[in-house]
Swiss-Prot record:
Its EC number is 6.3.4.4. Keywords: Cytoplasm, GTP-binding, Ligase, Magnesium, Metal-binding, Nucleotide-binding, Purine biosynthesis. Transmembrane segments: none annotated. This is Adenylosuccinate synthetase. It catalyses: IMP + L-aspartate + GTP = N(6)-(1,2-dicarboxyethyl)-AMP + GDP + phosphate + 2 H(+).
Length: 430
């Protein structure tokens, strides 16, 4: 039987998953996306060349990797076409290697209009979505009024579905949110055209995955966002609209639990968050700004500056527990170079008591004050180091402490943005 590894974020997203997925896709059978949409931004740097992927799996830059998009992903037609075109213009063969589940829901123009109008209306209480229609598309999926890839190939059914959806959403857009209605004919024509475009890529993703496993092929499940943004397990309501945890890999592709052999959790050597929501270790000072500048902490999808803070072990332990993480990958270690001291949150003060467990709601998280353990920093340059013994003593001590505090071994350490700036301590596929 083949081996399957799930790669997912163990914080609030932006942990560097794309680079690690690309690293692990050598001699891979397939890479599959299982949740989210083009709100993800996976940045790859190979031989100094930067590529940002939002929807297509990061394995697309490997010539022999099959790339799959599962039923759990919501697809923007415009975003997919744009990304395919950009990659093909750069000489990457995409359409013969990209397979998309017919059960994947579409992000329609009215979803984008709803997302943006709601965020504007919310003002200071906005969640901080990317405004790309992800949430409203998932709403329609659950409400059973979503339009899926499969529907594009039955024009009469598509017309009926679209009229029903627009009757509902245009009422909300015009009467409640006070913005313009979305035009039926334009939306219908665009949907039909996309149906023709996507037809050659439409495939039974679940069936492909089952066959690959029988053939002994390696499969990598590529998560987007992070565990603490999970719709069920994250800092609700400041979360994304899908299951970013390991269960999403199963439901979002159509494989069983026995198909997963290893779960790799990606975490930065510090912590970041984009948008609203609780962030106990956030640094609103020169230290936080320094981390942001050195780490180039600006969103790959939105360009928004990321909130930066110290490593939060309480949050990380929760991510390890709810995902059954087998090993951790610590990224951006080099960003901490030159810092005199480092802090790690090992517990919270919550309503007068010390706790090592995170509250289950955003309000509870907001009331938490971090309890820190301090570590010496290092002055040496770790950028690009690929051997454990060549790391500064203090850097090794810091990593070993994270490993012990999180109760999970560190499998990979990343010391820079390039694929080669990595040390693999334990190969997840070994």
């Amino acid at each position: 039987m083949g081996q399957s590894v799930v790669v997912l974020g163990a914080q609030w997203g932006d942990e560097g998953k794309g680079k690690i997925v690309d690293l692990l896709t050598e001699e891979i059978g397939a890479v599959v996306r299982f949740q989210g949409g083009h709100n993800a931004g996976h940045t790859l740097v190979i031989n100094g060349k930067k590529t940002v992927l939002h929807l297509i799996p990061s394995g697309i830059l490997r010539d022999d990797a099959l790339c799959l998009i599962g039923n759990g992903v919501v697809i923007s037609p415009a975003a997919l076409i744009k990304e395919v075109s950009e990659l093909e213009d750069a000489g990457v063969e995409v359409r013969s290697r990209l397979k998309i589940s017919p059960a994947a829901p579409l992000i329609m123009p009215y979803h984008i209009a709803l997302d943006q109008a709601r965020e504007k209306a919310a003002g200071g209480k906005a969640i901080g979505t990317t405004g790309r229609g992800i949430g409203p598309a998932y709403e329609d999926k659950v409400a059973r009024r979503g339009i899926r890839i499969a529907d594009l190939h039955y024009p009469p059914q598509l017309e009926e579905l679209l009229r029903t959806a627009l009757d509902y959403h245009n009422f909300v857009l015009t009467k409640y949110l006070g913005v313009e209605a979305v035009d039926f004919q334009k939306t219908y024509d665009e949907a039909l055209a996309f149906g023709d475009y996507v037809q050659p890529m439409k495939s039974d993703v679940a069936g492909i995955l089952h066959d690959l496993r029988k053939q002994g092929k390696r499969v990598l499940f590529e998560g987007a966002q992070g565990a603490l943004l999970d719709i069920d397990h994250g800092t609700y309501p400041y979360v994304t609209s899908s299951n970013t945890t390991v269960g999403g890999a199963l439901a979002g592709t159509g494989v069983g639990a026995d198909a997963i052999d290893y779960v790799l959790g990606i975490a930065k050597a510090y912590a970041t968050r984009v948008g609203g929501g609780p962030f106990p270790t956030e640094l609103d000072d020169a230290v936080g700004q320094g981390i942001r500048d050195r780490g180039a902490e600006y969103g790959a999808s939105t360009g928004r500056p990321r909130r930066c803070g110290w490593m939060d072990i309480v949050a990380l332990k929760r991510a390890v527990a709810i995902n059954g993480i087998s090993g951790l990958c610590i990224t951006k270690l080099d960003v901490l170079d030159g810092m005199e001291k480092l802090k790690v949150c090992i517990a919270y003060e919550y309503r007068g008591k010390r706790t090592e467990y995170a509250p289950l709601d955003a309000q509870g998280w907001e009331e938490c004050t971090p309890v820190y353990l301090e570590f010496p920093g290092w002055t040496e340059n770790t950028h690009g180091i690929t051997e454990w013994d060549k790391l500064p003593v203090a850097a090794r001590a810091y990593l070993r402490a994270l490993e012990e505090l999180a109760g999970c071994p560190i499998s990979i350490v990343s010391t820079g943005p390039d694929r080669d700036h990595t040390m693999v301590l334990q190969d997840p596929f070994a």
